[in-house]
């Protein structure tokens, strides 16, 4: 059996497992009736399948109808895309056609939410600036590779981060190119040990934003599924998905941080 066949079989088995779990005991929650599409693929070093296996069952237990795909062609189905409440993408260093990208962007602009983590959303399609504009940022570097670093929550009142403490990760500390029109919920500070000239640089780690009528949630951690063994990391991403899907009680529209606004005064 070739690798493509194996990947396709894995996707089918994963989707079936989630559907069985969902059908067995689907609670009546604020998310009941909402649909989420997980799309995974790209560079396998980011463990996209394992990460999807973390979150797909969690959303099913929240009442979502869950669909899982390994094909960006799913974005071509306009009727399907508009029926969704949320797209969760885990595709690093992929290639997307103009038609696939348009299908995704049109859906988000019309009000479908989008969420993701690490390179699966912020390093997906390096040749597509409009996609990066939609997401609100893109990966630039991870100085030092896998290191220990701290994530500091900056807004403890937001429903996505409420009640959660700062936490440490052993993962890639992403250095990002970030849209100032995002609302930042958590940051990290670079020590400069790998690159001395960035010592003290404070970088967004978690943000939310709008693209048209659609809500976008991004977390820059999640290099591997092990990152989500950290309870705060897993909970932030789960809550971010609920927010992007407009689940009641998950929070309102973002208030952009815009760190440069004081320069215009």
Over which residues does each language-model region extend?
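Bacterial N-terminal signal peptides that target proteins for export
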Residues: 2-13
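Bacterial N-terminal signal peptides
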Residues: 11-21
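Bacterial Sec-dependent signal peptides at the C-terminal "C-region" and cleavage site
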Residues: 21-31
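Short, solvent-exposed loop/turn segments at secondary-structure junctions
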Residues: 44, 94, 121-122, 189-192, ...
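Catalytic beta-strand/loop cores that center a nucleophilic Ser/Cys/Thr
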Residues: 59-60, 65, 83, 137-212
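A glycine-rich, often tryptophan-bearing local segment used as a flexible ligand/cofactor-contacting loop or short
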Residues: 94-163
């Amino acid at each position: 059996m070739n690798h493509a066949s194996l990947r396709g079989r894995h996707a089918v088995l994963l989707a079936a497992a989630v559907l069985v779990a969902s059908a067995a005991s689907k609670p009546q929650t604020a998310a009941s009736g909402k649909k989420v599409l997980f799309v995974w693929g790209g560079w396998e070093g980011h463990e996209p399948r394992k990460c999807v296996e973390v979150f797909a069952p969690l959303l099913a237990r929240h009442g979502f109808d869950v669909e899982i795909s390994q094909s960006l062609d799913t974005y071509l189905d306009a009727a399907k895309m508009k029926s969704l409440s949320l797209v969760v993408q885990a595709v690093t260093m992929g290639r997307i056609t103009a038609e696939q990208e348009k299908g995704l962007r049109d859906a988000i602009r019309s009000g479908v939410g989008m969420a993701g983590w690490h390179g699966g959303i912020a390093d997906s399609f390096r040749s597509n600036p409009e996609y990066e504009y939609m997401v609100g940022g893109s990966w630039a570097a991870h100085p030092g590779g896998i290191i220990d670093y701290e994530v500091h929550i900056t807004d403890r009142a937001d429903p996505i981060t409420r009640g959660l403490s700062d936490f440490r990760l052993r993962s890639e500390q992403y250095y990002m190119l970030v849209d100032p029109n995002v609302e930042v919920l958590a940051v990290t500070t670079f020590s400069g040990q790998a690159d001395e000239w960035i010592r003290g640089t404070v970088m967004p780690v978690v943000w939310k934003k709008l693209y048209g009528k659609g809500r976008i949630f991004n977390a820059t951690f999640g290099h591997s599924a092990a990152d989500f063994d950290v309870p705060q990391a897993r909970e932030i991403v789960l809550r971010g998905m609920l927010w992007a899907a407009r689940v009641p009680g998950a929070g309102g529209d973002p208030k952009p941080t815009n760190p440069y606004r004081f320069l215009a005064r």
